[in-house]
Amino acid sequence: MERVLKTNKGEEVSPNEAVFPILTGDIKTKEFTFVATGFFINPLGGFITAKHVMFDDNEQPINPFFAIQTSKGKTYLRRLEHFVYHSVADIAIGMLSDVIIKKNKLIKVPIETLYFQLSKNAPNIKDEIKTFAYPESTIIPDGKEQIGAFNGVWQNGIIEEFYPNGTGAFLKSPCYQTSVLILGGASGGPILHKGKVIGINSTAFKQLEGETPLSFFTPITEILDMSVIIGRNKRKTVKELISEGKILFN
C-alpha cells in the first residue's frame, strides 16, 4: 500500500508529518495518556479531529491537550491554543500554540507544518478509501519518565453506505459506513480518497474474527458551516478562510 502522502505543496512525505497523536497529561510529573489522532489543515498549526475525543468521560474538555508533531525528522510537543466544535457533527477544529515544551520549559519556535488539501467532492459507494492514524500507540513508564511509542498505521477499505441523517444517538449528522478497520485511538484521523481528505474517522463496531470491519466517518464538508477562533477571540467562518487560501478546499 502507498506509504507516502501528497501535501498542500504536492510533496510526497511520510504521513506522520501531517498526522499526529493526541495526548493529555502533566509535563511536570511527565505522566501522559494517549488519546486519539488529529491532522493538519493549514500551515500555522490548524488541525481537525473528531469532536468526541476532545472531551473526557465527564463531558469536560480535555485539559491539558498536547500534540506530538514530527517535522523534518524532529519531534515537538505542542500545546492546544484553542478549539471549536460542530454543534451536531463529530468534528472539532483546533489551533496548536507555536510554543513547544522542551525539558519542562516553554519555548517559542516557528515550526513548518505540512497539511492536507480537503475535498468538496462527495465520494461514491464502493469508492476505495484509506486512513492513517495512531491506534497502536503506547506510553510506558521508565523510572521517573515515560517512553512513548507512537506507531502510525495504514488501513484501507471501501465506502458501503451513506446516511444523510446520521445513524442514531451517536452520529446525528451525515456520515458514511465503511469497511475500514478503525481501532481505538484512530478516531480523529483523516479519511483519504485520491490524495485528499474527504472525512474524519468517527467510530467503529467490534466484529467477530473473520468478519468485515464496520466503521463510520463524518464527511469533511460538515466544517463548511463552522466558524473558528482567529487571534484574540476573533472569529472567521471556514468559508472565509477557504476564500483567503488559508484552508485548501477544492
Per-range role (PLM):
Residues 83-86, 227-250:
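Cysteine/selenocysteine-centered motifs that mediate thiol-based redox chemistry or coordinate metal-sulfur cofactors
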Residues 31-35, 42-89, 99:
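Catalytic-histidine neighborhood of serine endopeptidases
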Residues 115-150:
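Short glycine/Trp-rich loop-beta-loop segment that forms part of the substrate-binding cleft
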